[in-house]
């Protein structure tokens, strides 16, 4: 699935968190119905490696089926399912049944899991006249969840609420997940879907979204509308209320481990991210922090007087100095002198966000990379072409004339290294 180093890096990061701050996993009813084997396999794997996710589920498709069988027509208003007193018995039965089915499937997989179908969400009527027995959450009680976590058992929570007087209310599962996340402040929020992520205009999964640099442009795209636009807006609102390190992952149940434990992931990773600083002179940057970023990323030392002797064309640096691109000029084409990303920012999409901003302003570009550089797979995908030398791979973008490419290759061969072991 990934290198042992990658998996160990993420496992160490997750294991250092308080148990209830690891992850909230939102599971839709369609996943429970269609993909429960992959779901339970992935959740069981997390427990095997010492991590306990908090699972919250809906049961929309199952409820639709039961209501149809009972001759009751589904009615929604403003996205909320109208829940009349005569349908509440069916709602309760469906949620309890779905919850127990997931518990039993987890137990068959050797996992420990706890059924929680009440006692978490205190609620009041959203608007009884309009929606019937639909609740708006007024408080979240963590005691049942914490008891489950202390027993190293996966809490499996149904999105049902109760009024202070004990009336059961139907709670929208997305709303319940948002409120639970707001109280828990988890490191990861995971939405499991059949699509495996947010899709772009070509129907391909968007790997990562850095909201600080991409949200305004993304939300204006013609292919972002309806449910997808609403989902992105909801995720932004969710992350705005969470610590900077929190993130949302949207993936398939079968790909959950890959999304969590590899830099590349498998799905869409959404983070608030960091603003990107653009500089054209070294004096506009915090050079000690930039030096630390470069040396930590490459695990090598910059040559003495690097900043004094290197003519800067442009630098793109994340505001917390966790990722940077440095451009200089060798000849007439911008030269990518450094692309550095700290270990703890790997897999966040932060490096890609900085890279994308640089590329928007830099149609022509060339750079070199050592043969054993782990970023080479990324460079192959991002470049228009490459050439192998004894010690370097030379990559380029936007160069179409052989003579120009030849000059860039020659520059790379002659340019002395600026990092030493």
Curated annotation (Swiss-Prot):
Site (Transition state stabilizer) residue list: 26, 231
EC number(s) given by UniProt: 2.7.2.8
Location, primary (coarse class): cytoplasm
Keyword Membrane: no
Binding locations of substrate: 59-60, 81, 170
Catalytic activity: N-acetyl-L-glutamate + ATP = N-acetyl-L-glutamyl 5-phosphate + ADP
Localization, UniProt: Cytoplasm
Any GO CC annotation of this UniProt entry: cytoplasm
The protein's name in its UniProt record: Acetylglutamate kinase
Lineage of the organism: Bacteria, Pseudomonadati, Pseudomonadota, Gammaproteobacteria, Lysobacterales
């Amino acid at each position: 699935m990934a290198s042992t180093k990658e998996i160990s890096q993420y496992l160490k990061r997750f294991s250092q968190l308080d148990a209830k701050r690891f992850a909230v996993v939102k599971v839709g009813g369609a996943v429970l119905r269609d993909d429960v084997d992959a779901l339970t396999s992935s959740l069981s794997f997390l427990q095997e490696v010492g991590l306990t996710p908090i699972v919250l589920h809906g049961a929309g498709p199952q409820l639709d089926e039961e209501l149809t069988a009972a001759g009751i027509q589904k009615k929604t208003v403003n996205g909320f399912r109208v829940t009349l007193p005569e349908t509440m018995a069916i709602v309760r039965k469906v949620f309890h049944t779905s919850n127990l089915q997931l518990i039993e499937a987890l137990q068959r997989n050797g996992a420990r899991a706890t059924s929680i179908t009440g006692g978490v969400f205190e609620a009041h009527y959203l608007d009884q006249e309009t929606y019937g027995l639909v609740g708006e959450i007024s408080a979240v009680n963590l005691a049942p969840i914490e008891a489950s976590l202390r027993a190293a058992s996966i809490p499996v929570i149904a999105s049902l609420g109760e009024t202070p007087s004990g009336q059961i209310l139907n709670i929208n599962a997305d709303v319940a997940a948002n409120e639970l996340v707001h109280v828990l402040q988890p490191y990861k929020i995971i939405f499991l879907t059949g699509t495996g992520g947010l899709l772009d205009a070509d129907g391909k999964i968007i790997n990562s979204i850095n909201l600080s640099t991409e949200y305004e442009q993304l939300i204006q795209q013609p292919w972002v509308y309806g449910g997808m636009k609403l989902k992105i807006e909801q995720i932004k609102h969710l992350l705005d209320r969470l610590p900077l390190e929190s993130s949302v992952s949207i993936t398939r149940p079968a790909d959950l481990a890959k999304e969590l434990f590899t830099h590349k992931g498998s799905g869409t990773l959404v983070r608030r991210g960091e603003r990107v600083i653009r500089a054209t002179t070294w004096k506009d940057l915090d050079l000690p922090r930039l030096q630390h970023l470069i040396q930590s990323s490459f695990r090598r030392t910059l040559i003495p007087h690097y900043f004094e002797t290197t003519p800067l064309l442009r630098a793109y640096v994340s505001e917390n100095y966790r990722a940077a691109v440095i451009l200089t000029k060798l000849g007439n084409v911008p030269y990518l002198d450094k692309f550095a990303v700290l270990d703890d920012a790997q897999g966040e999409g932060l490096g890609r966000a900085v890279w994308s901003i640089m590329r928007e302003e830099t149609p022509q570009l060339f750079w070199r990379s050592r043969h054993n550089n782990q970023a080479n797979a990324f460079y192959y995908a991002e470049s228009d072409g490459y050439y192998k030398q004894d010690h370097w791979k030379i990559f380029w973008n936007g160069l179409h004339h052989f003579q120009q490419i030849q000059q860039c290759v020659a520059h790379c061969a002659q340019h002395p290294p600026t990092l030493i072991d």
